[in-house]
């Protein structure tokens, strides 16, 4: 099986650490799943961007997949109310 390398940007790490422990655990589990299949689960392309979002309950993981480099860059982790605001 081919795996992807997950790279979490500083902003996403900060956002993750600010969340309740149970939500952190769910998101970390989702990130682990993304290593083997980045588009599994509730994933949709974000309109007007090359990024995708994965839904984890009320939270969203915003990420970019580089198929050539086999990397997933985690850009943001936020509550759905804030996820789509720029």
Tell where the protein language model's regions lie, with residue ranges.
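A short, surface-exposed loop/turn module that caps and links secondary-structure elements
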Residues: 30-54
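Charged, low-complexity, helix/coiled-coil-prone segments
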Residues: 1-7, 33, 51
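Enriched for short, Lys/Arg-rich terminal
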Residues: 2-18, 22-25, 40, 56, ...
């Amino acid at each position: 099986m081919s795996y992807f390398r997950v790279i979490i940007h500083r902003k996403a790490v900060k956002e993750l650490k600010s969340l309740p422990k149970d939500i952190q655990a769910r998101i970390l589990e989702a990130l682990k799943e993304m290593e083997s299949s980045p588009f599994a689960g509730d994933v949709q392309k974000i309109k007007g961007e090359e990024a995708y979002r994965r839904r984890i309950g009320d939270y969203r993981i915003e990420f970019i997949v580089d198929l050539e480099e086999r990397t997933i860059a985690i850009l943001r982790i936020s509550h759905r109310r804030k996820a789509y605001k720029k």
